[in-house]
């Protein structure tokens, strides 16, 4: 236990304002929802995740995998083989969370063309840049 003024103080569990707050605590991070999405397919090796999630750096991917593991939603499986073989799987908790993201994936699929157009207009694609 941590000490405050030489007295042991019990750690305080985080308080969440609502269920969404608790969910966001787990999935906040640019790549975490994509990691969960790709792990829904089953055991996945690091290299497969790296190829599937474009533009993520090794440092950030490793950090976010560790954070998701600490949150109890994924498991790192080290097979203790030579050459080394490691993969990642969702825990039961992670399965339920990743499945909850599926409606968001469907929304993105249904609205992808509209979103591409809006972002292109916003970012000035297709216009001459001054």
Residue ranges of each PLM-predicted region?
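C-terminal regulatory/oligomerization modules of transcriptional regulators
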Residues: 1-17, 70, 75, 92-130
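Proline-rich low-complexity regions
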Residues: 54, 83-84, 99, 103
């Amino acid at each position: 236990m941590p000490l405050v003024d030489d007295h042991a103080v019990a750690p305080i569990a985080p308080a969440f304002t609502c269920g969404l707050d608790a969910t966001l605590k787990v999935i906040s991070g640019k790549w975490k929802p994509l990691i969960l999405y790709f792990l829904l397919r089953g055991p996945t090796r690091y290299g497969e995740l790296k190829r599937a999630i474009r533009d993520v750096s090794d440092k950030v991917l490793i950090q976010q995998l560790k954070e998701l593991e600490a949150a109890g939603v994924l498991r790192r499986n080290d097979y203790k083989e030579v050459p080394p073989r490691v993969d990642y799987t969702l825990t039961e908790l992670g399965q339920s969370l990743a499945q909850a993201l599926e409606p968001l994936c469907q929304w993105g699929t249904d609205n992808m063309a509209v979103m591409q157009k809006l972002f292109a207009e916003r970012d000035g694609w297709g216009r001459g840049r001054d």
